[in-house]
C-alpha cells in the first residue's frame, strides 16, 4: 500500500481522541497479509483488549437491572465459580447477557477493557479458568447488557 503505519496510527488516535463512533479499515487484504506489519501493530497497540458493542441510545437507552447476589467460590484445580441472580430489562423481549470482569483491585474497574474476561454469557453462572494459574484474579464483577449495548451497574465480589 501507498501508506505508512504512522498514518494509520494517527488516524486511529484522531478518531479516539475526538470520541468518534467507530472506525473502519480498507482494504482487509492489507490486514490479512500483514502489509507493513499493520496487523501486528493493531493487535499489539490498538486492539489488545476485548471491545463491547457500543450503546445505541436512539433505539433504547435504559440499561438492564444489575445482576444481584454474586457468589464466588474456588472449585477444583484452582478454577473459580461465579453465580448470580438474573438481571431484567425494560424490554420483555430482551434477555440480558452478562459480561464478566476480573481484577486484583477491588472494586473491579468495569471501564477498563483489560478487565473483561468473558462476554455474551447467557447463563447466570460462569467458570473462571485463568490461562496462567499464577496470574489468577482475586476480585470479580458481573454486569448485564441488553441487545442495544446498554450496560448495567456491576455486582461486585
Indicate where each model-derived feature is located:
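Substrate-binding cleft of secreted/luminal carbohydrate-active enzymes
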Residues: 1-58
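Generic recognition of flexible, low-complexity loop/linker segments
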Residues: 10-14, 69-71, 128-129
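Active-site donor-binding loop signature of nucleotide-sugar glycosyltransferases
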Residues: 28, 86, 130
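Short, solvent-exposed coil/turn elements at secondary-structure transition points
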Residues: 29, 70-73, 106
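Pro/Thr/Ser/Gly-rich low-complexity, intrinsically disordered linker/stalk tracts
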Residues: 37-93, 134, 147-157
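Recognizes extended acidic, P/S/T-rich segments that occur
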Residues: 93-135, 147-155
Amino acid at each position: 500500500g501507498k501508506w505508512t503505519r504512522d498514518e494509520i496510527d494517527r488516524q486511529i488516535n484522531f478518531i479516539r481522541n475526538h470520541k468518534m463512533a467507530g472506525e473502519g479499515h480498507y482494504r482487509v487484504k492489507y490486514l490479512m497479509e500483514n502489509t507493513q506489519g499493520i496487523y501486528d501493530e493493531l493487535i499489539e497497540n490498538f486492539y489488545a483488549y476485548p471491545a463491547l458493542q457500543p450503546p445505541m441510545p436512539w433505539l433504547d437507552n435504559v440499561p438492564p437491572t444489575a445482576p444481584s447476589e454474586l457468589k464466588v467460590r474456588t472449585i477444583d484445580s484452582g478454577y473459580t465459580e461465579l453465580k448470580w441472580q438474573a438481571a431484567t430489562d425494560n424490554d420483555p423481549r430482551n434477555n440480558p447477557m452478562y459480561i464478566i470482569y476480573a481484577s486484583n483491585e477491588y472494586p473491579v474497574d468495569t471501564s477498563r477493557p483489560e478487565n473483561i474476561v468473558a462476554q455474551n454469557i447467557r447463563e447466570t453462572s460462569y467458570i473462571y479458568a485463568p490461562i496462567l494459574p499464577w496470574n489468577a484474579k482475586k476480585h470479580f464483577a458481573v454486569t448485564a447488557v441488553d441487545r442495544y449495548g446498554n450496560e448495567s451497574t456491576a455486582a461486585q465480589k
